Design a protein with these regions (language model features):
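Non-catalytic structural scaffold of enzyme domains
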Residues: 1-235
């Protein structure tokens, strides 16, 4: 079978390594095409909302990847749900939102006899509103009674950008330890994936599942394109 070409569209350089590392570990046969426009996150933080001009830029990136022969497109920027939906409508290949697969896995933990309590941690504050809406909509569609708690981890992303990954991980873990009781913790940004082990160690006495987006996304794309997913997992 011909190796699939997966377009990875980023709005921050911090997301590039986590998803490429997951592909190398889980699906090394895939050919990854990375496109980065790091001004998108800057502009969203400045404007406070997703504008028509930003959506058009996403469409332009999508059209480029399709012209380059992409078999699937994965967006790694978690604050641009509406723009990604617009791109999916103009694509003839699978298009995946960054957290869609992780949300599906979290919702699979739901039980009929009680609410599913989910904690969503984010280091990029503008992403919380759109991600919360997306998760709530997915839960509603599945008739799942969801209790969602969100928390922003300020300055953690800046520490990561400055090269202090351990401080970034520690801040996320400290915030996780202060959360109310829940059934699962979700790490919102792709750039948070490397903090998963630190968070799990901080919560080791609770056996609480901690999910990150990159691994879930790779596995979902494998399934969408009909490739074998029975391989070693790093999630």
């Amino acid at each position: 079978m011909k190796p699939p070409r997966i377009a990875l569209i980023h709005a921050t350089p911090l997301a590039v390594s986590p998803i490429n590392d997951s592909f190398k570990s889980l699906w090394p046969q895939a050919i990854c095409q990375n496109l980065l426009d790091d001004s998108l996150s800057v502009d969203l933080a400045r404007d406070g909302e997703l504008t028509e001009a930003m959506i058009k830029r996403f469409l332009n990136l999508t059209h480029y990847t399709l012209s380059a022969g992409a078999d699937a497109i994965l967006f790694t920027c978690s604050a641009f749900g509406v723009a990604i939906e617009a791109c999916a409508k103009e694509s003839n290949v699978p298009v995946l939102k960054p957290n869609e697969a992780m949300f599906d896995e979290a919702l699979s933990l739901a039980r009929t006899d009680k609410k599913l309590k989910v904690a969503l941690l984010a280091t990029f504050n503008p992403s919380i509103a759109s991600m919360s809406e997306e998760l709530n909509q997915m839960a509603k569609a599945k008739a799942i009674d969801l209790d969602l708690v969100t928390a922003h981890v300020p300055v953690a992303m800046q520490h990561l950008a400055n090269g202090d990954a351990q401080k970034h991980h520690d801040l996320i873990a400290q915030t996780a330890a202060q959360l109310p009781p829940c059934d699962v913790i979700l790490l919102a940004q792709f750039s948070m994936a490397a903090a998963k082990q630190t968070v799990s160690e901080k919560l080791k006495n609770s056996n609480l599942p901690v999910l990150s987006s990159p691994v879930c996304a790779v596995q979902a794309l494998q399934k969408a394109l009909g490739f074998d997913t029975h391989i070693d997992q790093i999630n």
